[in-house]
């Protein structure tokens, strides 16, 4: 077992072995995020699904109300006049077969790849490169579309794609330590609603197993999922 650093061990002693109310958990995470940079706040959620079955896979997008606090690099593979549209909309990389070839040679200087449907036969050839990194465009994720400009705008504004990994765990970065706990909760609530809304048809038994939040350099805190689901804004 990996030995905890003195810093991590000290922070961990402040956390009780119990399930916390959402805002209390987020307060603790913010308090412990004391590195010399603005730490990213993450959610790690274990779901009662087995993604090896197609009807138990989860892959979708969510538009967080307060964004993620991170800037992302977007690449767009398209054709014709859409190339100039992608450039005008703020894409960091854009092109046709030239970009396909560049990516195939190892150019992975982007966080998200968007493609128009007409280019997908060529993009499909990049499966070996894109697949392991989770970067293959997908209609369900909103990354295969003819509305290039709007897709770029939404993802730059904080829309993000997430999926359950092979173990049925969802890993999502949903803010920064500099966010207020209320803003972090708004994002977390929106994420929870998206996961419930997109529950796989083949999911059986208990859907939500465990729900943890953490920061880049801090320990994790378990959150009461029922309290998140049952929250109703005042007024």
Curated annotation (Swiss-Prot):
InterPro entries: Ribosom_uL1_bac-type (IPR005878), Ribosomal_uL1 (IPR002143), Ribosomal_uL1-like (IPR023674), Ribosomal_uL1/biogenesis (IPR028364), Ribosomal_uL1_3-a/b-sand (IPR016095), Ribosomal_uL1_CS (IPR023673). The keyword Ion transport does not apply. GO terms for molecular function: rRNA binding; structural constituent of ribosome; tRNA binding. Keywords: Repressor, Ribonucleoprotein, Ribosomal protein, RNA-binding, rRNA-binding, Translation regulation, tRNA-binding. Transmembrane segments: none annotated. Binds directly to 23S rRNA. The L1 stalk is quite mobile in the ribosome, and is involved in E site tRNA release. Protein L1 is also a translational repressor protein, it controls the translation of the L11 operon by binding to its mRNA. HAMAP family: Ribosomal_uL1_B. This is Large ribosomal subunit protein uL1. It comes from Prochlorococcus marinus (strain MIT 9301).
């Amino acid at each position: 077992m990996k030995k905890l650093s003195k810093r991590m061990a000290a922070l961990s002693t402040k956390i009780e072995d119990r399930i916390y109310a959402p805002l209390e958990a987020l307060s603790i995470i913010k308090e412990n995020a004391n590195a010399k940079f603005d730490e990213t706040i993450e959610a790690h959620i274990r779901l009662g699904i087995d993604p090896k079955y197609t009807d138990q896979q989860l892959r979708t997008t969510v538009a967080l109300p307060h964004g993620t606090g991170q800037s992302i690099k977007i690449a767009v593979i398209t054709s014709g006049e859409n190339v100039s549209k992608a450039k005008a909309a703020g894409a960091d990389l854009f092109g046709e077969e030239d970009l396909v070839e560049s990516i195939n040679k190892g150019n992975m200087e982007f966080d998200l790849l968007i493609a128009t449907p007409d280019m997908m036969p060529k993009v499909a050839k990049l499966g070996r490169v894109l697949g392991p990194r989770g970067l293959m465009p997908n209609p369900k994720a909103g990354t295969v579309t003819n509305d290039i400009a709007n897709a770029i705008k939404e993802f730059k504004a904080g829309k993000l794609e997430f999926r359950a990994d092979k173990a049925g765990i969802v890993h999502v970065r949903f803010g920064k330590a500099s966010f207020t706990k209320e803003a972090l909760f708004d994002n977390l609530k929106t994420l929870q609603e998206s996961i419930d809304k997109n529950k796989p048809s083949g999911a059986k038994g208990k859907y939500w197993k465990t729900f943890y939040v953490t920061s880049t350099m801090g320990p994790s805190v378990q959150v009461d999922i029922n309290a998140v689901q049952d929250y109703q804004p005042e007024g």
